[in-house]
Amino acid sequence: MPIPARTAALGGSSIALKDDDINTAFQNPALLSEKTSNSISGSYINFLGSVNYGYLSYGKSFKNIGHFAAGLQDVGYGTISARDEYGNQTGTFTGNDYNFSLMYAYDHDSLLSYGVTVKTLYSKYAQYSSVGNAIDAGITYNKASKLFCLSAVMQNVGKEWKTYTGGPQEKLPFNILLGASKKFKRAPFRLIATYDYLNIWNLTYTDPNNPTPTVDPFTNQPIKTTPVKNFFDKLGRHFIVATEVVVTKNFFVRLGFNYKMREELSLPDKKGLAGLSGGFGFKINRFNFSYAFTRPTPGYSMNSLTVGANFGKYTKAPKPLVMPL
């Protein structure tokens, strides 16, 4: 879940945006830099019903050592009714997922940086709980003079140590991503593209009860397909494309498209704006604000809000000189 609003507005990925936004390190730790030092940020999403997402982060750089950050992600599912096999309510319980992250990045030179994130994962539903650890690693090539950034990220290398019921340990969703962004000197926008799940070719959801469907379950019509159509459908599910329009140096408009989200969450006869996202951001002195509007499925919209501040880059105005009489 792309909690930071800027990431949500850009379709769910921001692994190749190296600037003063500490939230981009949520997906790629190599994006930490001196510009994110002394930055603090908080994000919030009100999801379906009483489900709420939150994320807090803080970054600090140390000369000749590197760039550090810490983040805490929380998914709260509210109060849920507990029922027996006959549907009778037996009480209530709560559910939460937590992710505590420690991030580090180092600048190899003026162009190349690399970073690592160590995540501690904790999940609890009623009396059932699970604990795990995972590592993310990223490398970024940033050519500031050409306004070009290229990144590769490996996510969720880890293990579940404690399972909910004492059964077999579950695998973590390992992912390899490639991303690039390019801003044009004479145009007020940057183009952003991410290739998701480089390690898995076929991301199409397969129903275990009907692994090779020939009839559309909603329309009852035969599914017409060709090898070429299948290829481009599978290829499209890997790509997230977006643009960020730089209206002024302190105001931005964002738009993203996630084909995989559109195909998985839309209805066959009503796709609407599923998979589209958009938003804006602006800065006032040391503070920055971002808002995102995401349409994961027809009939439902998700709103994201991020508020942050960078205390390292803010300096007070000098005192006026007093001329001696």
Which residues fall in each region the model found?
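Subset of outer-membrane beta-barrel
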Residues: 1-325
